[in-house]
Amino acid sequence: MTAAPDARTTAVMSAPLAEVDPDIAELLAKELGRQRDTLEMIASENFAPRAVLQAQGSVLTNKYAEGLPGRRYYGGCEHVDVVENLARDRAKALFGAEFANVQPHSGAQANAAVLHALMSPGERLLGLDLANGGHLTHGMRLNFSGKLYENGFYGVDPATHLIDMDAVRATALEFRPKVIIAGWSAYPRVLDFAAFRSIADEVGAKLLVDMAHFAGLVAAGLHPSPVPHADVVSTTVHKTLGGGRSGLIVGKQQYAKAINSAVFPGQQGGPLMHVIAGKAVALKIAATPEFADRQRRTLSGARIIADRLMAPDVAKAGVSVVSGGTDVHLVLVDLRDSPLDGQAAEDLLHEVGITVNRNAVPNDPRPPMVTSGLRIGTPALATRGFGDTEFTEVADIIATALATGSSVDVSALKDRATRLARAFPLYDGLEEWSLVGR
């Protein structure tokens, strides 16, 4: 006779979050309210679809699966093998790549694995200077990339704020790096991947492109693809790609074995199979016409904001746009001639219901926790459904706040921002999905 289940165990396994941990449930509900009622304009953030949230909150959370499909160190992987193969196949198809590894937990982990595969400690790495828009993992001295490797940097022209490929070539010829990274965290222009490839070939370097910020634009065919030019390409899945927070790697087949080994066991243990399921869903969505339309609105919105922030009334207040515009999903705002610094401007926009992040501008005189700039992005609002009309309104709210400064009517601007947010409901019915504990 089968014993009755232990009531204590079954109660915990079936009880909702609000009952098990009301503190966390309340905080999730508050965060949902914040996301719904404010305008999210941090360039590295987006909203994952319901299907991705469901995949990432699924029973795959329970499964350990060290290794690769068909070559696991654990039993019971027959279903997660199919999940991972789907994710890999979709990544290869979406970006036209020869191989894909979908196990990196983040973009930083992806970069760490690629560098581990392509370089040895002490060898030379050339990347975009953090102060000019580069990423921590491109050689910043406190990051693993700055500690394990000898680092050189290229930057932007001090007048145009554009990357000068002749200057990159000169730096590479002098520094002779083992790997060149082309990519950025805060640079509003398209990179010349063919020129980077030519320079890498000339100095005998491997080329890694970090497309974490613009991968969604590449997937939609609205941004040049780095895949034909790079040896390896890394990305996150949660920025313009609009999936869950995670990373992936694509590239040439000749590097697959080294990179697979660098991810596991080199950098990570077991992959997060629930997250990989979410990646598979996001990659499927990224191949749809709806996704391409969203990316078009993302680009258009960024250009609308850049144009408004270059208008005479804003320029008169000492506000300018780095490089004079944007080719991508973000606008980098220069406040060096404004009464506002980056921290003050971020706080002001937060008060009116718009979330952005302060960001260094090229050759910024202020410390990193203050900065002289803002980074403003459009992916999350495009995901909500914003088009040119709504982005024009958002641009005017931002322009009014930055041009007026401390004397701005915060209440009036917040009313405008809140009306816009509520006109495009976010996660309608999420409470009923049992994903916020209510």
UniProtKB/Swiss-Prot annotation:
GO terms for molecular function: glycine hydroxymethyltransferase activity; pyridoxal phosphate binding. The record marks 238 as: Plays an important role in substrate specificity. Catalyzes the reversible interconversion of serine and glycine with tetrahydrofolate (THF) serving as the one-carbon carrier. This reaction serves as the major source of one-carbon groups required for the biosynthesis of purines, thymidylate, methionine, and other important biomolecules. Also exhibits THF-independent aldolase activity toward beta-hydroxyamino acids, producing glycine and aldehydes, via a retro-aldol mechanism. One of its GO terms (biological process) is tetrahydrofolate interconversion. It comes from the Bacteria. It catalyses: (6R)-5,10-methylene-5,6,7,8-tetrahydrofolate + glycine + H2O = (6S)-5,6,7,8-tetrahydrofolate + L-serine. InterPro entries: PyrdxlP-dep_Trfase, PyrdxlP-dep_Trfase_major, PyrdxlP-dep_Trfase_small, Ser_HO-MeTrfase, Ser_HO-MeTrfase-like, Ser_HO-MeTrfase_PLP_BS, SHMT-like_dom. (6S)-5,6,7,8-tetrahydrofolate binds at residues 130, 134-136. Belongs to the SHMT family. CDD domains: SHMT. SUPFAM superfamilies: PLP-dependent transferases (SSF53383). Its main location: cytoplasm. It comes from Mycobacterium tuberculosis (strain CDC 1551 / Oshkosh). This is Serine hydroxymethyltransferase 1. Transmembrane segments: none annotated. Homodimer.
